[in-house]
């Protein structure tokens, strides 16, 4: 059984490898791998059953096309739209009764793992009835804009506040290449103060564009 993940940032890649990824494809919002890129990855993984985690809605089509073009291996595309559900998706892999591979829990992964991404606006716009100015910091959730404002830390906190609920147990924070370790650690400490009953994890994601990628589960 093999595991291919699309990742962006050295830290994100390291985490994927630690979780058992056999092959990483560089991707992200501005670097969308092609069908050929996914096919090359499939060729490099020596397994009959291979799970592919696109981790971006724009890459799911390419992954599905690569699956359809592959005849000698069983390719299972898990339609993850962001990286955190892809991390947790690996825990749902198991062997089928016939020795093949099955994926149990795709719906559960998407239901229980919420993702938030904090970035900046490149132009003036209006989304989800929110006025956004060029340079504003935005917190984006699974279903739209959660927070808009001026400060990265403050908007990240607002984004997480909007994501947590009574079932939340873990908050995982992945800080990007434009965030210092000190700033990320300070954010983690504030989260621990605000949510003392939750496990708070701070990781160096190294991703560009997004100051923070957050998962809440």
Features from the language model and the residues they span:
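N-terminal loops that bind phosphate or other acidic moieties
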Residues: 1-217
């Amino acid at each position: 059984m093999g595991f291919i993940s699309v990742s962006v940032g050295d830290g994100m890649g390291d985490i994927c490898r630690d979780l058992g990824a056999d092959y990483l494809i560089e991707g992200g919002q501005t670097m969308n791998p092609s069908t050929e890129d996914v096919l090359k990855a499939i060729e490099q993984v020596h397994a009959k059953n291979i799970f592919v985690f696109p981790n971006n809605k724009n890459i799911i089509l390419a992954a599905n096309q690569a699956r359809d073009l592959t005849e000698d291996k069983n390719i299972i595309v898990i339609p993850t739209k962001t990286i955190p559900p892809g991390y947790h998706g690996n825990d749902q892999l198991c062997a089928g009764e016939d020795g093949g591979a099955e994926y149990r829990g795709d719906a559960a992964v998407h239901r229980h793992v919420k993702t938030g991404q904090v970035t900046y606006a490149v132009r003036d716009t209006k989304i989800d009835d929110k006025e956004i100015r060029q340079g504003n910091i935005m917190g984006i959730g699974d279903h739209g804009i959660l927070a808009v404002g001026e400060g990265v830390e403050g908007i990240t906190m607002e984004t997480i506040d909007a994501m947590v609920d009574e079932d939340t147990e873990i908050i995982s924070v992945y800080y990007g290449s434009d965030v210092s370790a000190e700033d990320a650690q300070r954010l983690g400490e504030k989260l621990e103060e605000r949510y003392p009953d939750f496990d708070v994890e701070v990781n160096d994601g190294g991703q560009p564009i997004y100051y923070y990628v957050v998962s809440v589960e």
